Amino acid sequence: MKFIDESLIRIEAGDGGNGCVSFRREKFIPKGGPDGGDGGDGGDVYLQADENLNTLIDYRFNKRFAAERGENGRSSDCTGRRGKDIILPVPVGTRAIDNDTKETLGDLTQHGQKMLVAKGGYHGLGNTRFKSSVNRAPRQKTMGTPGEKRDLLLELMLLADVGMLGLPNAGKSTFIRAVSAAKPKVADYPFTTLVPSLGVVKVDDSHSFVVADIPGLIEGAADGAGLGIRFLKHLERCRVLIHLVDIAPIDGSNPADNVAIIESELFQYSEKLSEKPRWLVFNKIDTMSDEEAEERVREITEQLGWEEDYYLISAATRKNVPPLCRDIMDFIIANPREAETQQVAPEEVKFKWEDYHQEQLAGYQFDDDEDWDDDWTEEDDEGIEFIYKP
C-alpha cells in the first residue's frame, strides 16, 4: 500500500434547518395561535483515530466530505430532524490544520480519540418562539445558519520513541533490521529508503520501544535536494534522535563534515527539533580494527567539539548493538513522553453562530398586536419577516 502522509480535503458541516411560520387550524378554533416548529441543527464533521490505519491513502482522491443538512421545522410545533454527523477515520498520529489560517485544530494520538473539525449550523426558530402578550400572531421566523466549511490539511506524523538520522547509506535501515522484526529494503546505493518505516525493539520481556527510520538527508535538503526534509516531521514526537554516522564513507568524505550537514539541515527545518536529545552512533566499525576505529572517532569528536557520550557499533554484525538498545530503553523510561499539542475537545469549540439566536431574540422589537388575516396560508409568504438571510 502506498504511504501517504499528507492530504488536503474539503469538509462541510450541514446547514441548520429553517424555522417554520404556521398557525393552528382546527374546527371551532378560528385563531389557534402560532405553531411553527424550529428547524434541526446541521450535522458536524469529526475525525477519529483508528489504529488499524497507517496511511492517508483513503483521502488521496476522495477530497470532499459534507455532513447532512438539518430539516426545516413544520407545523404543529414539529421540530426538524438534526442532520447526521460524519466521522472520518484517520491513522493514529494525524494532525489537523486549517489550510487557510494555518491554525492547528488538534492531534489525534490515541486510538478511538475523536475531534470536532467543523460544526453544523444552528437551527432556525419557528414563529412560536416570537409569540408574546403583545404579538399573539407572529409571522417572524429565523433561517438556519450555514455550517462551517474548511479546507483541512491532514498530516500524519509517526508515533515513535526513537528517530534515526543520517546521510544516505549510513546504515539506518540495516540498524532497524538488526534490532527489530521490520525488514526495510537494504542496498548499496543511496536513497534505498523512500518512505518512513517503523520497527519495534524488544529489549526484554517487559520493555520495548518504537524506532522510526526516515529517508536519508543530504546537503541542501532544506532547499529540496534529494528527498527534501518533508519526512523530518515524523521525528517531532520522538523522545531521542539517533544520529548514525558512517565511520568510513565510501566516497572518502569527512564524517565530521557529514555530521555538520545533518545538524544544519535539522536546524533549518525546526529549531525545536534540533534541540531534542541527540546521540552520536558511529556505524560500520567492522570495516577496521578496534584501535583504528577508536582513533578515528576521537579525531571526529575533536573536530566537532562533541563532549557528550557516543557509541561505536556495527549494525551488520550487531556488535555493541544490544548495549546501545538497553541505554536507549533506560533513557526512555527516565524521560516520559511530553504532552502532545493541546487537543481541541468538541465541547471546547466555540462556533461563530453559537450566540446568534440569543442575540436576535434579545434585540428584536415586537410591534403591537394586530388582527391577522384568516385567509392566510402557509404558502403565502407575504408579511413574513426573515430575521436572517444567508
Curated annotation (Swiss-Prot):
Annotated residues for binding of GTP: 166-173, 191-195, 213-216, 283-286, 314-316
A biological process from GO: ribosome biogenesis
Listed InterPro entries: G_OBG, GTP-bd, GTP-bd_Obg/CgtA, GTP1-OBG_CS, GTP1_OBG_dom, GTP1_OBG_dom_sf, OBG_GTPase, P-loop_NTPase
Enzyme Commission code(s) on record: 3.6.5.-
GO molecular function annotations of the record: GTP binding; GTPase activity; magnesium ion binding
Gene3D superfamilies assigned: GTP1/OBG domain, P-loop containing nucleotide triphosphate hydrolases
Uppermost EC category: hydrolase
Domain OBG-type G: start-end pairs: 160-333
Pfam entry (one): GTP1_OBG
One Gene Ontology cellular component: cytoplasm
HAMAP family: GTPase_Obg
Family under the similarity heading: Belongs to the TRAFAC class OBG-HflX-like GTPase superfamily. OBG GTPase family.
Protein known as: GTPase Obg
Organism: Haemophilus influenzae (strain 86-028NP)
